[in-house]
Amino acid sequence: MSKIDLTALATEARNPRTTELDALSTLDLVTAMNDEDRKVADAVQRELPRIAAAVDAIAARMHKGGRLFYVGAGTSGRLGVLDAVECPPTFSATTEQVQGLIAGGAGAFLQAVEGAEDSTTLGPADLQARGLGSKDVVVGIAASGRTPYVLGALAFAKSVGALTVAVVCNAGSPVAAAAELPIEAVTGPEVLTGSTRLKAGTATKLVLNMLSTGAFVRLNKVYGNLMVDVQTTNAKLKARAVRIVGEAVACNETLAQQLLDQCDGEVKAAIVVGRKRVAPAVARTLLLTHDGSVRDALAAP
């Protein structure tokens, strides 16, 4: 394997503010970290137009039945998995609709798999195993912007006509160049040199939050700022569903629960029933007619 040159990467540079990190008092140490973390939001802000473009493109593909794949290694891969697994309970997405792939497979989430991220063939193999097609979206995540696993995945995605997005934390990287829609949240040197689980990881999480949340908002999974497609799979989420219906209908918890019971726990239908005073079957028809949009269903005559 050829020698890797990391000297040009901002994420690998020494942070001049923390060259004496081990000598700082604990308060000064965490203050330095907090000060550096403040820069993350600014790095993401600079990329908002690109992030918005990616959200719209992802939503358009998913509306036609496409899937969203996050692909990364190490921390980047784990962040993709983390975002993907939250989509089913939050938006009633299927486990197929948003998937997180990490170099080395599921076991690499808890323990690093030696050499997996350095392979340009594992990424294509992982995507091929999931039947990647032209309707799908692949988001390549790599703080460094040079991870071979991600580069291979993006190249394969392009070859089958899938939309490609990159989320990186260095400017002018190979991963960004390999994607149709690159997002470069340049966070600079880490407090601990090269530890991209810190600022770069935080920036990546913020971007992924926007990509998935924004896409599902565009897919009518949200009404106002209410999580109206929540899956009521545990006590906390059942209680949240009651509160959501209560907020949307402007009713007490008792009536909200009754509406949910009438609608077999479907929050969207319960809101339409409560607001329009229609039967659950009519509410479901209105929602189906208006592509799942609570707002449009409520506005319908």
What are these regions (language model features)?
Residues 1-43, 47:
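Cofactor-/ligand-binding subdomain signature composed of acidic, glycine-rich
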Residues 69-207, 215-219:
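Glycine-rich phosphate-binding loops that contact phosphosugars or nucleotide phosphates
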Residues 57, 153, 211:
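Aromatic/hydrophobic pocket-lining residues that form π-stacking "cages" and hydrophobic walls in ligand
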Residues 11, 32-40, 100-111, 223, ...:
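Gly-rich Lys/Arg/Thr-decorated short loops/hinges at beta-loop-alpha junctions or inter-strand turns
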Residues 49, 111-112, 232-234:
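Active-site pocket-shaping loop/turn-to-helix segments
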Residues 210, 215-301:
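Short, amphipathic alpha-helical interaction segments embedded in low-complexity terminal/linker regions
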Residues 46-61:
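A short, well-structured juxtamembrane/interface segment
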